[in-house]
Amino acid sequence: MHTTTILICFFIFLVQVSTMDAHTDKYVRTLCGKTAIRNIANLCPPKPEMKGICSTGEYPSITEYCSMGFSDSQIKFMCCDNQ
């Protein structure tokens, strides 16, 4: 019975530790950064005649994008306002 209690406590500890890391700012920024670039590329597809992804030449900061939570319409205005 004592061994079972220790195993249960250990399992609960592992679950708590794994979920703590899932919600840290660094973890959220990492996930956001990966999806932000794909989302911006989908909203403002690059054109062959342009060197960058954005027609205005101003690529939005990924840090700002993730911390401010820009909407799709804001990204279109900042990045591809002529589309």
Curated annotation (Swiss-Prot):
**According to the lineage, what is the superkingdom?**
Eukaryota
User: Is Phosphoprotein set as a keyword in this record?
Assistant: no
Keyword Signal carried by entry: yes
Q: Name which cysteines form disulfide bonds.
A: C32-C66, C44-C79, C54-C80
Task: Specify the signal sequence span.
Answer: 1-21
A Gene Ontology cellular-component term = extracellular region
Locations listed in the record: Secreted
Alphabetical UniProt keywords? Disulfide bond, Secreted, Signal
**Record-stated family:** Belongs to the insulin family.
From the Swiss-Prot or TrEMBL record, give the protein name: Probable insulin-like peptide alpha-type 2
Gene for this chain: ins-22
